[in-house]
Amino acid sequence: MDSLNLNVINDDEHPIPNQDLLEKCFALVADKHNISQAEVNVSIVSNQEIQQINKQFRHKDKPTNIISFEFEKPEGLPEDIAANFWGDIVIAPEVLKKEAKEQNKNLDDHWQHIFIHGLLHLLGYDHIDDIEAEEMENLEIELLAELGIANPYIEQEN
């Protein structure tokens, strides 16, 4: 049975785009990687919460737009348990809104870009060096084009 399960937790009811947009991004990334079964948890948090998480795990004491935590199977856990679990994503919608405004981008398009970026991190992509960054950015551009979204790395005019 094929299934993609996106668990969105938004306890404080932060403004987010229609969840269908996020599910469409999830399906697109999974399909691109020939994955038919997957699960991801997404927590929508305040700037203060993401700043605390960013400080604790990345040693950067400032809010950020998204943080991805790739699932690492604990030793001894049977292979079939959590076999399709990619990990957890934490998103700060206030940061995304500010970035979209500053970069003159459509807010829903920016959400989709950053969410795809976070999903790719869960699949092991990174941007630590220039080669990895170029590979990840090119894949993001390709996936976003399939959604009808312009290249986010080209500066938008105000």
UniProtKB/Swiss-Prot annotation:
Keywords: Cytoplasm, Endonuclease, Hydrolase, Metal-binding, Nuclease, Ribosome biogenesis, rRNA processing, Zinc. It is found in: Cytoplasm. GO terms for cellular component: cytoplasm. Its EC number is 3.1.-.-. Binds 1 zinc ion. It is an enzyme of class 3 (hydrolase). GO terms for molecular function: metalloendopeptidase activity; RNA endonuclease activity; zinc ion binding. InterPro entries: MetalPrtase_cat_dom_sf_prd, YbeY, YbeY_CS. This is Endoribonuclease YbeY. Single strand-specific metallo-endoribonuclease involved in late-stage 70S ribosome quality control and in maturation of the 3' terminus of the 16S rRNA. Zn(2+) binds at residues 117, 121, 127. One of its GO terms (biological process) is rRNA processing. Belongs to the endoribonuclease YbeY family.
